């Protein structure tokens, strides 16, 4: 993988995480009655989505419908069968109950 490809992958991950974080912040602001602030966070999240989609397209991560469905099935299957069971096991071993609940939900 070239440096640029690594940078694109890192940028995609960062923009994607920022999107989800800003949406979580917006939800919190709504709960606190701060609708204007929530709107700002949603706008920032939307901008991050545009950036993430651009990086994903350049990386060749958006294909035809059949391929997109297969990538989704494979990814969700991995999470369900391998990733989360291991995460749950490790969190249980560390006695981190909130993490166990988060990984199960």
Task: Give residue spans per PLM region.
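Non-heme di-metal
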Residues: 1-105
